[in-house]
Amino acid sequence: MDNMILIEGNKFKLQEDGIYSGAYLGKMNIWGRETDVIFENVDKSEEAIEKLIEKVSWLNDNKLNVIDAFMEENYECIEFASEEFDTEITEDDFRDALFVGNIYIFINGKDSEFSFDLDTEPDYLCGHLANMIVSGKYEIECDGING
């Protein structure tokens, strides 16, 4: 197995130990930031790589939909952050602070799902991350706040 693959000019290196052992780790631009992308697939076929590119492109094109899905389930985070920061944080402030911290893509056929963690800057989530899941049919849901 090759220990490196190139996807759209980005190097992905095979992780031989640790939490992502057996997966390829690289960086891609998501929502204007260099973001860790974990790509797990047994065969590094062209079809699998195209699926990864499709998922990342979809995420870049659907930022507003992702943020809307998060806010729909977690609107109370604004009040929590306002209390923690002892200042009024508006919904726009909170939305503007959200970014994708990392993305995990496991290619398993046509309906492959992927997940990613939303983070904030400033740290309105107080060290936590919001895990988001996108189904093979591109349905978005928040799987909870971790950390």
How should each PLM-predicted stretch be described?
Residues 1-85:
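Long, contiguous N-terminal structural blocks used for assembly/anchoring
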Residues 36, 90, 141-142:
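A sequence-level detector of short linear motifs
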Residues 1-16, 104-147:
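Acidic, proline/glycine-rich low-complexity IDRs
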